[in-house]
A protein has these predicted regions:
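Structural/interface elements that position substrates and couple domains in central-metabolism enzymes
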Residues: 1-119
Length: 119
């Protein structure tokens, strides 16, 4: 496992969760989501989105992937990937409130020299 980077994935939905499982093959990963129920199901080995096979989820958890709804748990990361949905309204304008909230959250835990990637 590569020790140089510890990756925090913010948003464990259709994009962030498969990404977290994939990165967990090589890196230390902490997945973060505001939905406690989502965190509980993932930590129990269940993926209600069906984006990841049960075997891939089990492998990610076995490799040390941690999932949490506690923002402070991300402080040990040095790479942050924000994978938050940006739905559009009836006029095709993106709803940016969730993205702004996620950005503020990341801003509360990053350190100088860390990387932030928006997916």
């Amino acid at each position: 496992m590569t020790e140089k980077y510890k990756i925090g994935i913010i948003g464990l939905g259709y994009v962030g969760f498969p990404l977290a499982c994939l990165f967990a093959k090589k890196y230390k990963v902490i997945g973060y989501d505001i939905k406690e129920s989502r965190i509980n199901e993932i930590n129990q080995g269940i993926d209600s989105t069906n984006e990841v096979t049960p075997e891939a989820l089990k492998a990610a958890l076995s490799n040390g992937m941690k999932c949490t709804s506690r923002l402070d748990d991300l402080k040990s990361c040095n790479v942050y990937i924000v994978a938050i949905p940006t739905p559009v309204d009836d006029f095709h304008n993106p709803e940016l409130v969730p993205l702004k909230k996620a950005s503020i959250a990341v801003g509360n835990v990053i350190s100088k020299g860390d990387y932030v990637i928006y997916e």
